[in-house]
Amino acid sequence: MYFKKKYIGLIDKNCEKKILDDCTTIKICYILIGILIGTNMITLIYNFIFWDHYMTCNKKDKMFYCPKDWVGYNNVCYYFNNDSKNYTTATNSCKQLNSTLANNDTNLLNLTKVYHHDKLYWVNYSLNDNFSLSLRNSTYEKRSKYLPLLFICSK
């Protein structure tokens, strides 16, 4: 029933329209679908065989991962704690997270300009028995170790 229809299709060498029937049109569609499926299969097989090339990183790549709720910056992970604690308790809390109080360095200064710049944090630096440094607005201030402040852990 459908195989008796004729369609204007391709143009031959003499620039005349060729008339195609249903069988020829269906054959052309099957050939095109076969080519598409074949190229996709070849691509999948190639990617499967050479997957190692896609997974390796160059040694120049600086890729690192931080735990959930930690902030990654310059190959260091920082944790901004929301609980105020004194210097000793803050140090112990960081140890429980397998980290230390953040060191007072340029990376931390740059990071605090972006995150929580108006808060006061303990950093890893003792002045003497009862004092340590705290960080606020990218500047360091001398504080009593017994004063409860927020703190930043790093690892």
Curated annotation (Swiss-Prot):
It is a single-pass type II membrane protein. It is found in: Host endoplasmic reticulum membrane. It holds the Pfam family UL45. GO terms for biological process: symbiont-mediated perturbation of host apoptosis. Induction: Expressed in the early phase of the viral replicative cycle. Expressed in the late phase of the viral replicative cycle. Disulfide bonds join C66-C77, C94-C153. Residues 66-154 are annotated as: Lectin-like. GO terms for molecular function: carbohydrate binding. Residues 1-30 are cytoplasmic. Keywords: Disulfide bond, Early protein, Glycoprotein, Host endoplasmic reticulum, Host membrane, Host-virus interaction, Late protein, Lectin, Membrane, Modulation of host cell apoptosis by virus, Signal-anchor, Transmembrane, Transmembrane helix. Belongs to the asfivirus lectin-like protein family. Homodimer. This is Lectin-like protein EP153R.
